[in-house]
A protein has these predicted regions:
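Long, contiguous internal "core" modules enriched in hydrophobic/ aromatic residues
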Residues: 1-125, 132-135
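Juxtamembrane non-transmembrane "cap" segments at the membrane-aqueous interface
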Residues: 135-155
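Hydrophobic alpha-helical transmembrane segments
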Residues: 122-127, 173-177
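A generic transmembrane alpha-helix motif of multi-pass inner-membrane proteins
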Residues: 159-191
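Membrane-proximal termini and loops of membrane proteins
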Residues: 135, 191-194
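Catalytic-face loop-and-helix region of soluble metabolic enzyme cores
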Residues: 115-119, 149, 181
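Short, highly charged, low-complexity non-transmembrane loops/tails of multi-pass membrane proteins
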Residues: 197-207
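Short, membrane-exposed interhelical loops at transmembrane-helix boundaries
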Residues: 80-85, 148-171
């Protein structure tokens, strides 16, 4: 699967997305669980800056990969996969999910939140990035599967089970949503048991 292989940018993208999603979760969680004024505190600003630079760096890497595929006129197998991503049947996952929610909206909401000193905009950026990261992983998995490993491979066998066309089934969506709900529930229970809000302090102040 050529789309799944690459040079230095591939492992860097995985590490960067892990940092981005972690910062986004912490930022959204901290803003959402803080019973205080909407003015961001030091921890909010630090997480927001980490998220901002991470998103910009990720956007630069993805732009380079897209330019690389476009400059080859989509002629390589990896280029064909990129063409499927940007203009295929699920183009909205890339343009709305990955570009809009992962790259554009977080940058503007973070800058707006820091300028207006309103942590609610920072919380929105965290939630937006979490959804965008999910869309980014869909763009990594599905196009890599639907593009044949070499030309005419999809014509060698004619059977529904051997088709390269793929989209998650209802069962797969249900399992994913169910596991996500269990993880969120476990987190909320642990947070309540540890009485998180009474012991987390930054600079000697309760946050």
């Amino acid at each position: 699967r050529p789309l799944w292989h690459g040079g230095w940018e591939k492992p860097l993208t995985f590490i960067l997305l892990a940092v981005i999603s972690g910062a986004a979760f912490l930022l959204a969680n901290h803003v959402g669980n803080s019973n205080r004024s909407p003015h961001p505190q030091k921890v909010d600003r630090e997480l927001a800056l980490v998220l901002l630079f991470g998103v910009i760096f990720f956007a630069v890497i993805e732009s380079f990969r897209l330019w690389e595929a476009w400059s080859s006129s989509w002629s390589t197998v990896s280029g064909q996969a990129w063409k499927t991503i940007v203009s295929g049947p699920y183009w909205y996952v890339f343009w709305i999910g990955q570009v809009g929610l992962l790259m554009v909206l977080p940058v503007f909401s973070i800058l707006l939140g820091l300028q207006r000193t309103d942590s609610r905009w920072l919380g929105i950026s965290g939630l937006s990035v979490l959804v965008g990261v999910f869309a980014s992983r869909l763009n990594f998995i599905i196009p890599g599967l639907v593009e044949p490993a070499f030309s005419k491979l999809d014509l060698a066998y004619q059977h529904p089970r051997l088709s390269v066309q793929y989209f998650p089934s209802l069962t797969e969506w249900t399992i994913t949503i169910g596991l996500g709900a269990i993880i969120i529930l476990a987190y909320l229970v642990i947070q309540r048991l540890l009485n998180h809000g009474n012991w987390m302090h930054v600079d000697g102040k309760k946050v």
